[in-house]
Amino acid sequence: MMASNVSRDVSQDQSSVVQTCKPWYAFATVAAGRFVRFASRVTKHGGSALPGKVVEKIDPGFLTRTLGQLPLGVVLVSGTNGKTTTTRMVASMLSDLGLKVFTNPTGSNFVRGVVSALLTEVTLGGKLDADIAVLELDEAYAVHFVKQVKPRYALLLNVMRDQLDRFGEIDTTAKLLSHVAAATTGTVVLNREDPRIAALAAKAPAGTTVRYFGLADDLRRYFPSDDDMATTVSVEGVAGPFPSARTPLSPLRGQLPSEREAAAGTAELPADVTLTAVGDHKATFQM
């Protein structure tokens, strides 16, 4: 697949930032960030977030400007569980298809972590040599990320009750992810098996495509949702639009041990990437 076959438009806001940045300023930002990273490693203070924090202070437009260079934009992966594995799978598949992929390493799934990861990849002039970024973002930090960078693709996995100390009820987590869906410009890919995630289709803006991933019918009974466990369900009233139909999906059989593999295999990719190519790759991916 040739990356040139895919539209390379960049948003007006991001383009204007790239055009107005002086070369010396980009150099100063990268140099300062790398110095802080070196110093934090030598002193064993600050971790992966400190360089990103410093760069955010001295050059608030660095993230938008740098990711705005990508001809194929940003794929944002978020949800309660499975983010790291899914991000690795999508990045690996795109790389095998011939694209240069930038991705953030495990543990840096917050905005400053992405900035810190960029510092290791850009040239001193601020050039990022990549076609597309596949980024894992924590649910809470994803909200702040999309205020600076609108993803072209979003892959939203699930909301689960394993972080009650952070977010409270899972409806709060779903609300956080709704901001990601609302900011996505190209395609939002949602988990059909998670009702709260599937409902985010209503948040996608006009012109943004919505796609779903899910389990084969013979596997769905092994992964019940909270709603499936209820003995009685009643609806007393609906305040807004309510879906009247479900789009039929073609199940992927025999290769889906869990939802995250399904997500990686059905993510909406550039137009000339086929499911056949993705399916061939899944057989060789090493967990």
What is each residue range found by the language model?
Residues 85-102:
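A conserved segment at the C-terminal end of the G1
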Residues 151-152:
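Proline-aspartate-enriched helix->loop->beta-strand connector
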Residues 156-287:
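Acidic, Mg2+-coordinating active-site environments of NTP-dependent enzymes
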Residues 99-112:
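Short beta-strand-centered segment that lines the nucleotide-binding/catalytic pocket of NTP-utilizing
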Residues 82:
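Conserved glycine(s) of the Walker
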Residues 115, 120-148:
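Conserved nucleotide-sensing/catalytic segment adjacent to the nucleotide-binding pocket
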Residues 2-9, 13, 17-78, 93-97, ...:
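Short, basic phosphate-binding NTP loop
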Residues 111, 141-143, 197-198:
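Short, well-ordered alpha-helical microsegments
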